[in-house]
C-alpha cells in the first residue's frame, strides 16, 4: 500500500488544496527527485471501478464503493496519492520512480445530476497536468456517445486546444483506455479501432482556435488500449491482467513503456505543484468552460453539421458552373446569386428547427464563408477587368495624336473612363449581396491605377530625357573639344556660353518662364524643377568628363606644340620660313614659345576671363559632401582635386612644360642643322682649282714606284670587282662605314649645340616666369 494516505487535491467545492506542496515534501522526504517522477490520472463513469483499479495497480488506498451496501458516489473532487509500488508480473530490483496518482470524481453521477461543470473541468485538469490519463470504461459502453464519455471528451479536447493548443512545444498526453470486463468475444483490436475512429471524428468536428486549424489529434495525444478481465468472475485473470499492465509502467526501454520523455512536463516537483494550481485557476476562471445546456450543444452540433453539408455541396458545384462564365459580368453574377441562394435555402430548411440564436449565428457564419469563397472569383474578375482596361488606356495614350492631345490630357481621360467602368462592375456585385464591402477593393484599385500611371509617366519621362540626352551629349562634346583643340585666352568663356546655349536649345520646348520648365507629363512644379536639375547635372557631368578626358598631359603638350609651330615655322601670311642665321631662329623661337605658353595656364585651370574659377551650380555626384572628398590620391601616389576647374596638378604642369621644352628644342635643332648643312657644302669650282694646283703633285705620284705599285693593286682590285659583279657588297660596306662615321660626327656636333642652347634657354625661361609673375 501507499506509504501515506491520499489527500483531496481539489474538493467538491472546486477549491485547490493549499498544502499540496507540503504533502509532496512529506512523500519524498529529503530526496532530490528532480524530474524523476510521474503523474497519472484516472477518468471514467461513476462506480466503474476507477479507485479499485488504482488501488490494485499502484497499491494506493483510495476509498472504494461497497457494492453490497449501495451503489453511490465514493470519490468526490480530485484525490491525490503517492506510490513507488506498482503491481507487476516480475520483481523489479532497480529503484522505482515516484508516481503521483490522481483519482478524478466519476462522471455522469446522479449526485450532480445535470450540473456537468465540475466533471468537465476535472477532466480538462487531468489532461492538462498528467502524463498518462487512464480512461476507465466497460466493454459494453464502447459505441455509446454519453455512456463512454465521448461527449465529455469532445468538450475537453476543444477547450484544451483553446487553452493549451498554441504552446510551441512537443508535449503530449498518453490516453490509456482500460476496457473493463473484457471477455474476449470481441477482439481488443476491434474495440480499439472503434474508439479510435470515434476520437478522430470528434477531433475533426472540433471548433479549433486560430493557429490550430490544421492540427491533428496525434499532435497532442497518443492512444493505447488494454483489456482487463472481470474482477469478480475472473479474479485470477483480472489480477494477472493488472500485473501485465503494471509492467508497462516500470519496464524502461521496452516498446510498451508508458512514461515516455515527451509526456513529461519537464518541471521539478515543486514547479509542478505551482503549474497544477495555475492550471486549475485558469480552468476555473475561463468562461469558455461555463458550457451551455445540452439543448444548445445539440443545436450547435447539428447546425454546424448542416452548414458544412450545404457548404460542401456549394463548393462541389461551384468551379464547374462558374469557370465558363468568368469573362461575362451578367452571366457570372446571375450564377453566383443562384448558387448562394441554393446553399442558404438548403441550410434554412433543416437548421431553422433548432434554437433561433444558434441557427442565425451559424447562418451568418455560413454566409461569411460563402462570401469569402465568392470573393476570390470576384477579385479574379475585377483583376482581369483591370488588366483589360489598363491595356486599353496604354493603347489610347500611345496612339494619341501628339499634335493635338498631350500626354496629361490622354491619361486623365483614360483614367476617368476605366474608373467609371470598374466602379460600375463593383457596384453590380455589391447590389446583389455578393460583395459585403468594397472599400478595400476600391483602395487597392486606386493605389494600383496610380502606381501604373506613375509607371506610364516614368516611361514617358524616360523617353523625353533620352531624346534630350541623345542630342545634348554629342553636341556638348563636339563643341567643347573643338574649342579646346584651338584654345584662346577666353576659351572658358566661350565654352560656358556654348554650354548654356546648348542646354537651352535642347529644352526650349518645355520652358514656360525664366528658369521654369514644364515637361508636360503631369508633374508638380517641384518635380519639374528636379528634372531640370537632373538635366543640368547630366550636362555638367558630360562637360566634366569631356574636359578631363581630353585635357590629358599628352593632349596639352600637343596643343602647345601646334601653337608653337604655327608661329615658328610659318610667317604672318602662313608661308613656311627659310632660315638664314641662328639669330633669326632664336628670335622666332622666343616669339613662338610665348605664343604657345599663353594658353598653358588656361588649360591647367578652368577660370573665366575675369579670373573667376568655374564651379558647377549642381552637385556633380551623389557622394559629393564637401571639401573632405575634393582631394584624392591615385595609384601612383599623386594627389588630385575632384573640383571641376582643377585640370592639372603642379607636378603634371611641370611634366607638360618639360615635354613641351624637349619637343620645341628638337624643332630648333632641326632648323639650325639645316643652316650648318648649307654652310659646309663644297662648291664645284673647288675641284677645278684642286686639279690645276695639284698637277705637279699628281706627276710626282706617277713617277714614284711605290705609288705606281699601289695604283696597279687598286686597278686589279677594281677589275676583279667589276668582272665578278661585286659592286653591291662593296657599296654596302662603304655605306655602312660612312653612315657610322656620319652618326658619330652628328652626335658630337649636337651635343655641342644643345649644351650651348640649353644654357641660353634656362635664362630665357627664368626671365619669362618673372615677367608672368609681374603681369599677374
UniProtKB/Swiss-Prot annotation:
Positions in the Lumenal compartment: 703-705
Main location: endoplasmic reticulum
Effect annotated for changing residue 50 to A: Abolishes GTP binding
EC nos: 3.6.5.-
Coiled coil: none
MF-aspect GO terms: GTP binding; GTPase activity
Cytoplasmic topological segments: 1-681, 727-776
UniProt cross-references to InterPro entries, sorted A to Z: G_GB1_RHD3_dom (IPR030386), P-loop_NTPase (IPR027417), RHD3/Sey1 (IPR008803), Sey1/RHD3-like_3HB (IPR046758)
Pfam families: RHD3_GTPase (PF05879), Sey1_3HB (PF20428)
Note: Present with 2265 molecules/cell in log phase SD medium.
Name of the protein described by the UniProt record: Protein SEY1
Organism: Saccharomyces cerevisiae (strain ATCC 204508 / S288c) (Baker's yeast)
Top-level taxonomy: Eukaryota, Fungi, Dikarya, Ascomycota, Saccharomycotina
Amino acid at each position: 500500500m501507499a506509504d501515506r494516505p491520499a489527500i483531496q487535491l481539489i474538493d467538491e467545492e472546486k477549491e485547490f488544496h493549499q498544502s499540496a506542496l507540503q504533502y509532496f515534501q512529506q512523500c519524498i522526504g529529503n530526496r532530490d527527485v528532480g524530474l524523476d517522477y510521474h503523474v497519472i490520472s484516472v477518468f471514467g463513469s461513476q462506480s466503474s471501478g476507477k479507485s479499485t483499479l488504482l488501488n490494485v495497480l499502484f497499491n494506493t488506498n483510495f476509498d472504494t464503493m461497497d457494492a453490497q451496501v449501495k451503489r453511490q458516489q465514493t470519490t468526490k473532487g480530485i484525490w491525490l496519492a503517492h506510490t513507488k509500488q506498482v503491481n507487476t508480473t516480475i520483481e523489479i530490483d532497480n529503484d522505482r520512480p515516484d508516481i503521483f496518482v490522481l483519482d478524478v470524481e466519476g462522471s455522469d453521477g446522479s449526485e450532480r445530476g445535470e450540473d456537468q461543470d465540475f466533471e468537465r473541468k476535472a477532466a480538462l485538469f487531468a489532461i492538462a497536468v498528467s502524463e498518462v490519463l487512464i480512461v476507465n470504461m466497460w466493454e459494453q459502453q464502447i459505441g455509446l456517445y454519453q455512456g463512454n464519455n465521448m461527449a465529455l471528451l469532445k468538450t475537453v479536447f476543444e477547450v484544451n486546444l483553446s487553452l493549451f493548443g498554441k504552446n510551441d512545444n512537443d508535449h503530449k498526453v498518453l490516453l490509456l483506455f482500460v476496457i473493463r470486463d473484457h471477455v474476449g468475444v470481441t477482439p481488443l483490436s476491434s474495440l480499439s479501432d472503434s474508439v479510435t475512429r470515434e476520437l478522430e471524428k470528434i477531433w475533426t468536428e472540433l471548433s479549433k482556435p486560430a493557429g490550430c486549424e490544421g492540427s491533428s489529434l496525434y499532435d497532442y495525444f497518443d492512444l493505447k488500449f488494454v483489456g482487463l478481465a472481470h474482477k469478480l468472475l475472473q479474479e485470477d485473470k483480472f489480477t494477472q491482467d493488472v500485473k501485465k499492465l503494471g509492467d508497462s509502467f516500470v519496464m524502461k526501454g521496452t516498446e510498451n513503456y508508458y512514461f515516455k520523455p515527451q509526456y513529461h512536463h519537464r518541471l521539478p516537483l515543486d514547479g509542478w505543484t505551482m503549474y497544477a494550481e495555475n492550471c486549475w485557476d485558469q480552468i476555473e476562471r475561463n468562461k469558455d468552460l461555463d458550457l451551455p445546456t445540452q439543448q444548445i450543444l445539440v443545436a450547435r452540433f447539428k447546425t454546424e453539421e448542416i452548414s458544412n453539408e450545404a457548404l460542401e455541396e456549394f463548393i462541389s458545384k461551384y468551379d464547374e458552373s462558374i469557370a465558363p462564365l468568368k469573362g461575362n459580368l451578367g452571366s457570372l453574377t446571375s450564377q453566383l446569386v443562384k448558387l448562394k441562394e441554393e446553399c442558404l435555402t438548403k441550410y434554412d430548411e433543416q437548421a431553422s428547427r433548432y434554437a433561433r440564436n444558434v441557427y442565425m449565428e451559424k447562418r451568418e457564419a455560413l454566409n461569411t464563408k460563402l462570401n469569402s469563397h465568392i470573393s476570390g472569383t470576384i477579385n479574379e474578375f475585377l483583376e482581369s477587368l483591370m488588366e483589360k482596361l489598363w491595356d486599353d488606356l496604354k493603347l489610347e495614350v500611345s496612339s494619341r495624336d501628339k499634335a493635338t492631345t498631350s500626354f496629361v490630357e490622354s491619361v486623365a481621360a483614360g483614367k476617368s473612363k476605366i474608373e467609371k467602368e470598374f466602379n460600375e462592375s463593383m457596384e453590380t456585385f455589391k447590389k446583389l449581396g455578393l460583395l459585403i464591402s468594397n472599400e478595400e477593393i476600391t483602395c487597392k484599385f486606386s493605389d494600383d491605377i496610380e502606381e501604373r500611371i506613375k509607371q506610364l509617366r516614368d516611361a514617358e519621362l524616360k523617353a523625353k530625357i533620352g531624346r534630350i540626352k541623345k542630342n545634348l551629349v554629342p553636341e556638348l562634346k563636339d563643341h567643347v573639344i573643338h574649342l579646346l583643340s584651338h584654345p584662346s585666352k577666353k576659351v572658358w568663356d566661350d565654352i560656358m556660353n556654348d554650354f548654356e546655349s546648348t542646354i537651352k536649345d535642347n529644352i526650349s520646348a518645355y520652358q514656360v518662364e525664366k528658369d521654369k520648365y514644364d515637361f508636360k507629363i503631369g508633374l508638380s512644379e517641384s518635380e519639374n524643377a528636379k528634372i531640370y536639375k537632373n538635366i543640368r547635372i547630366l550636362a555638367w557631368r558630360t562637360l566634366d568628363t569631356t574636359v578631363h578626358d581630353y585635357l590629358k598631359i599628352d593632349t596639352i603638350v600637343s596643343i602647345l606644340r601646334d601653337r608653337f609651330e604655327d608661329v615658328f615655322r610659318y610667317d604672318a601670311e602662313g608661308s613656311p620660313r627659310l632660315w638664314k642665321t641662328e639669330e633669326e631662329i632664336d628670335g622666332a623661337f622666343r616669339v613662338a614659345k610665348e605664343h604657345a605658353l599663353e594658353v598653358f595656364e588656361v588649360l591647367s585651370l578652368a577660370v573665366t576671363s575675369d579670373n573667376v574659377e568655374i564651379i558647377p551650380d549642381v552637385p556633380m555626384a551623389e557622394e559629393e559632401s564637401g571639401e573632405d572628398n575634393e582631394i584624392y590620391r591615385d595609384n601612383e601616389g599623386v594627389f588630385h582635386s575632384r573640383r571641376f576647374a582643377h585640370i592639372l596638378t603642379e607636378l603634371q604642369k611641370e611634366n607638360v612644360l618639360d615635354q613641351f621644352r624637349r619637343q620645341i628644342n628638337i624643332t630648333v635643332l632641326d632648323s639650325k642643322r639645316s643652316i650648318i648643312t648649307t654652310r659646309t657644302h663644297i662648291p664645284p669650282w673647288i675641284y677645278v682649282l684642286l686639279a690645276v694646283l695639284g698637277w705637279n703633285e699628281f706627276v710626282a705620284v706617277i713617277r714614284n714606284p711605290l705609288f705606281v705599285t699601289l695604283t696597279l693593286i687598286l686597278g686589279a682590285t677594281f677589275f676583279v670587282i667589276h668582272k665578278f659583279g661585286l659592286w653591291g657588297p662593296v657599296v654596302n660596306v662603304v655605306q655602312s662605314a660612312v653612315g657610322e662615321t656620319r652618326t658619330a660626327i652628328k652626335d658630337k656636333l649636337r651635343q655641342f649645340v644643345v649644351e650651348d642652347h640649353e644654357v641660353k634657354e634656362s635664362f630665357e625661361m627664368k626671365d619669362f616666369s618673372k615677367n608672368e609673375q609681374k603681369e599677374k
